[in-house]
């Protein structure tokens, strides 16, 4: 009986070490899943912001349908249209709308170091009846190094102004 006990000395310690290794691998897996869920949540938040920005400018286009191509031609610079005492025509209001919209996109969406924020564009197709606007919001996912292929996301929404 004593011979049997001598052969088993230290065996329970080996069992504990193996269990500890298995638990460690499991905990690392859980931590990896947690990090991925955080990244997915952040990407989802940016997509939501992009859709909200596109919907906002789509509503502005529908509210000002006579501005026509002014929305697509806007540079994004402030024209001072809404300053006290100024009268704004439809084209000037469109320029101001795009200025505000680009500011919001730059502040709420991530971009590359060169852009400083997300990029937004409005396309205008007057070859179809009624004319069609295409709103595009794009951004780069943060936390990606230059060596990796930085994923770029684009949300495009067609808008019929009438």
Say what each PLM segment does.
Residues 2-55:
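Aliphatic-rich helix starts adjacent to a transmembrane/signal segment
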Residues 39-45, 52-162:
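Flexible, low-complexity segments enriched in proline/glycine/serine and punctuated by aromatic residues
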């Amino acid at each position: 009986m004593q011979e049997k006990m001598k052969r088993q000395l230290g065996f329970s310690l080996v069992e504990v070490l193996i269990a500890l290794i298995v638990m460690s691998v499991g905990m690392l897996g859980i931590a990896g899943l947690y990090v991925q869920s955080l990244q997915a949540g952040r990407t989802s938040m940016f997509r939501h912001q992009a859709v909200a920005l596109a919907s906002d400018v789509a509503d502005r286009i529908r509210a000002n349908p006579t501005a026509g191509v002014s929305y697509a031609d806007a540079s994004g610079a402030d024209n001072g249209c809404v300053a006290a005492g100024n009268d704004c025509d439809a084209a000037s209001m469109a320029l101001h709308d795009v200025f505000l919209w680009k500011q919001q996109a730059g502040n709420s969406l991530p971009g590359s170091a060169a852009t400083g924020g997300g990029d937004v564009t409005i396309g205008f197709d007057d070859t179809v009846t009624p004319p069609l606007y295409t709103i595009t919001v794009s951004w780069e996912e943060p936390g990606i190094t230059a060596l990796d292929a930085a994923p770029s996301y684009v949300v495009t929404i067609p808008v019929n102004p009438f």
